[in-house]
Amino acid sequence: MRVTVNSIAAALSIGFVAVSPLSAQNATNCDPTANTKGDIAKAQFSMARAISASEKGNPTRDLQEVFRLVDNGNDNPTARNFLRGQAYIIYLMQPNAQPVVQRGTLGMTTNPTATVDLYAAADSAFSIVEKASPECATVTSQWRQQKPWLNALNGAINALNAGQLDSAEMLAKRSLVLDRHAPYAYSVLGSVAQQRKNSAAAMDYWKQALTAAGTDTIYADVRTKTLYEIASAGSDRADAATGAAKRAAAKEAIKPWQDYMAVANNDLLLADAIDNESRMYVDAGDSVSVSSVYAPMIANPSKYGEISLVHAGVVATRNGHQADALKLFDAALAQNPYSRDAINNLAATYIQNNQFPKAFPLIDKLVSIDPSNPDNQLLYAFAYQGLYKGTKDKKLQKIYTDSLVYFNNKSENMPVKLSVTEFTRRPDQTMLAGTIENRGTTPKTYSVSFEILDKSGTVISTETASVGPVAPKKSGTFRITSAKGGAYGYRYKPVT
């Protein structure tokens, strides 16, 4: 008998980034085109028409007029470059706009066949404005983060999530040309470098992401993601090392996990962090400190989710801290009365602690929700074995022995074994997956009906899966999806 928990596949992706409309761009202390006259005033008028046309039609002719007018003189370079930068951005916002075009395409008559990198040109123009008028940095930043930047950044994120590393790198770097202050592109480049096994480059990009994110709450998600990736990379280095190098790498990986856990807001990833940090302590030769990983959870379990509490309980069990494990599993069960992992592990821990009367009601509940799993019957057998060892009363020993044999045989002779390997719960969806093993001697097709439960045990959805035909001594798989969210557990009737 052992305490178990389902494994976690920890996956992270950056969410899409949004941007404010052109009409929302303003800064009370900045007006680079105030009190202009002549060509600049005319260019400003053409820019207003271009902005209006960009929302309803084609602004190209107005943009070409802006470029012609701002190039027709050298006075007031701040105003000219502000209008020039705006024009580059609006041009890039048009459908099928290319990042590099010939000057003639923009209506420029001087050297018309020469090319212009519009991202670099916009950056150069806005940089001149920012240097001359620092108070305009806010409004130029809003222009820098318009649709061209957004498209490059979200394109980089899409490419990264699709495993297209070259495209992800190119697009992320393109977005940095326009805006080097947001953390998203650095995070993408860090992930690209990590997947290319370039740990040094990945760490450099992740540090830049953290610096860019700072303490701004708008960047909290990317900051948390980056801290997780830094910590995961540390565990990977420790796992790949041996001997003294492994101990040193594991010791170094502990602090990054602590940093991540301090801000973690995802129960699944926090559970993964608990597993990793505790493992790093063990690999570093400091098993005594493992309890520090979950000590805050025992002190205030209501701050944590059931999954992280269960994982912490497993960590406590593996390191011989049974009393801590009981508290953690009990806290998890208080949060979710239908958590199979919490029920199973709490029952197993009670048995290990010779608290058999507390184990039996939990085993009863486990069998009621998961009746076709032979492992559950073995918990009865282990409990009766413990009771047998704890008494010298011959009559009781006979009763306990008979019960042990009964439940052991019941487990061994079950014709089918159903194992749930995935239970994914989302606000608007629930997914269950697993296997059905045919322990019989003839092929068979199985039908299993799952009831999805809320926290009170009320059925919120019923889903049926058919598996088979399954050959003798082989297994078939099932996967069901419910459109109902808010699930806490499941149950099914015995599979025959």
Q: Positions of the model-derived regions?
A:
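Residue-level recognition of tetratricopeptide repeat
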Residues: 44, 49-51, 86-93, 157, ...
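TPR alpha-solenoid repeat register
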Residues: 80, 138-139, 185, 219-220, ...
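Short coil turns that delineate tetratricopeptide repeat
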Residues: 74-75, 134, 180, 214, ...
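Short coil/linker segments at helix-helix boundaries
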Residues: 49-53, 61, 89-166, 195, ...
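Structural motif corresponding to the intra-repeat A-B loop/turn of tetratricopeptide repeats
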Residues: 91, 162, 196, 237, ...
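Hydrophobic/aromatic packing residues within the alpha-helices of TPR/SEL1-like helical repeat arrays
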Residues: 63, 67-70, 119, 126, ...
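Canonical tetratricopeptide repeat
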Residues: 83, 90, 154, 188, ...
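Single-residue signature of alpha-solenoid repeat helices
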Residues: 59-62, 115, 122, 168, ...
